[in-house]
UniProtKB/Swiss-Prot annotation:
It is an enzyme of class 2 (transferase). It comes from Burkholderia pseudomallei (strain 668). Catalyzes the transfer of a methyl group from 5-methyltetrahydrofolate to homocysteine resulting in methionine formation. The lineage of its organism: Bacteria, Pseudomonadati, Pseudomonadota, Betaproteobacteria, Burkholderiales. Belongs to the vitamin-B12 independent methionine synthase family. L-methionine binds at I435, G436, S437, E488, D603. InterPro entries: Cbl-indep_Met_Synth_N, Cobalamin-indep_Met_synthase, Met_Synth_C/arc, UROD/MetE-like_sf. This is 5-methyltetrahydropteroyltriglutamate--homocysteine methyltransferase. Its cofactor is Zn(2+). The gene is metE. Its EC number is 2.1.1.14.
Amino acid sequence: MTTAHILGFPRIGAQRELKFALERYWRDGASADAERALVDTGRALRAEHWRIERDAGLDCVTVGDFAWYDHVLTTLAHVGGLPRRFGFDAHALTLADYFAAARGNAAQPAMEMTKWFDTNYHYLVPEYSPATTFGPGVEWLFDEVREARALGHRAKAALVGPLTLLWLGKARDGLVERLALLPRLVPAYRALLARLREAGVDWVQIDEPIFSLDLPDAWRDAARPTYEALAPGAPKLLVATYFDDASEHAALLKALPVAGLHIDLVRADAQLDAFVADYPADKVLSCGIVDGRNVWRNDLDRSLARLAPVRDALGERLWVATSCSLLHVPVDLAHEPRLDEELKTWLAFAAQKTREVAALRDALVKGRAAVAAEFDDAAAAAAARRTSARIHNPLVKRRVAALTDADARRASTYSVRAAAQRARFGLPLLPTTTIGSFPQTPEIRRARAAFKQGVLDHLGYLEAMREQVRIAIDKQLAYGLDVLVHGEAERNDMVEYFGELLWGFAITSNGWVQSYGSRCVKPPLVYGDVYLPEPMTVGWASYAQSLSAKPVKGMLTGPVTMLQWSFVRDDQPRATTALQIALALRQETLDLEKAGIGMIQIDEPALREGLPLKARERAAYLDWAVRAFGIAASGVADDTQIHTHMCYSEFGDILPSIAALDADVISIETTRSNMELLDAFETFDYPNEIGPGVYDIHSPRVPDADEIERLILLALERIPAQRLWVNPDCGLKTREWRQVDAALAAMVDAAKRVRQKVEEAVPA
């Protein structure tokens, strides 16, 4: 019978139970009681998620998709591959050890973190050296298998595959080629798979999303011998590709000695023919037809029409699935009582998507009539969405159509603007600033909750937030920062805040997804044409500027990041939606400038994240992404300084496009990579000003002035002092004031030391 399954379920819980349990555990100092409570929470969440999968009608539940912090880190823990610098006993690894690798400790900084392919999820980057070894690791996966079996579930295990695990890591300490470690890694996987078979697991899903990339020949060539070594003694293996087209590797994948393949038909529908043609008779083909990365309801009739010929060709060897893990979507639409009812009919979250998968399986096996009510309801929702008047705004469409190339360019070159800005601001060498946000304290959260509950009126809420702005300005003046920010106390999220104020966006109550660790975000829904009805940030920026003679930056989230960190409508090109958002932001920059704000930061942390996985598609993306930023930023005068910020990015392959943004100042995240990201600037002469991060805000660890000074000096080896800024890696929202106070004081101290050294080195 055709099998219905998913590649993974969100791990955080419908009410973010895992987030809160993790934070209690860390807050309580990882005590025995706190660890028991955390373990109990994890067990309860897994049981609930398996119940949802079973009740939806899936043929098996997925185990191994749960992780305490990150599934890549958990896979390393399973195969004994955590970084050697921590000195952990791989087989006796504790939760405290695991979290130390993720978050750092007094002796070692945290592992580097970067984006999971082109998503907004962040994984911890494996560290590989010539001394790296692998072997038996933690028992967590086997514990989960036992839990699932005890609850009566048929369990399919899921693991990050060995090739992907190596690909995602970084070579250190003289290791030339990560693939050189494959002979050490394969035996660890082989032992793990053999134990899963002994535990009664019939199927193991091996995630190899790197087969959606343009792989070097050496990595392609490694696939067959790797799986020839893994298959004997293992359960049936389902090699899963997702996020893009794997058809260029179709012949290779079909020849692997595994029991099945999974392909993503949402992101790459055209690849289906390449796989179905001459598909091996001994393999199942799992078709990812339900979108694991977006929230729009599946057009079941359309999906059925796509799958029916595959069913005719493969029979029961066709499996129906989500395109990728549901990690990237919220848990359950049932927890959205306040969402607009019409909009709600257009949506499906993880729980609903599990049922869509099962409904498609039922229609293939029993006929559409067996699930006619579900199919008819989905068809009605799709028709209503196509014709709804709330989606289309003729004014917005006319404004987008009227855009010219000149609208996306500043009036003057950078050198002309820089002279005007130096004359206006008179900043010192190596100016210090922050990226934007300051700690979201319990006081801020209480005020926001009281306002949302109607306990605090609007004026009371505004005054509470203004008090937080005053605190932020006073603290920055005490640190001695040169350029200030208002702290963003009024913003619960850098995208959601704007989504609440722009037409064409909708905000959920519990549409949370995991970004990393305990960090969750609630992406807005872009359902229609985007329009700015009134200024969004001018009042806050103007008030903050009134408190100091030093410049205060206006803070906006850029059009590409708004797009990347939202669930975006799928009925028009993303480029069109980006231009609509850019036009709204352009009006906001002009309003800020008119109010006297001389520095405006338009954050684009997701620019690199949006880069297509296929090289052939990147130029087109970068063209419209750069144009959208230009539309947002280019209406202002020469002496208005435009900043931008990017994080978690490898920049080398897109530096020309970053330069084309023509921001006067760019800040980037570099601390965890020890300024390695700046290596690209040795061969590319970046023309404008740059602030490489010198303080890792993702770790509770507080650096001292000596450490920051060392990083500034490293940056000066690549960036001229006249164009170098000093700032943290990212916003400080998730940190505590005691950490921020110490770190920023150290940062200013370090900048002053280096400034003095540079000035003393310049001949009078």
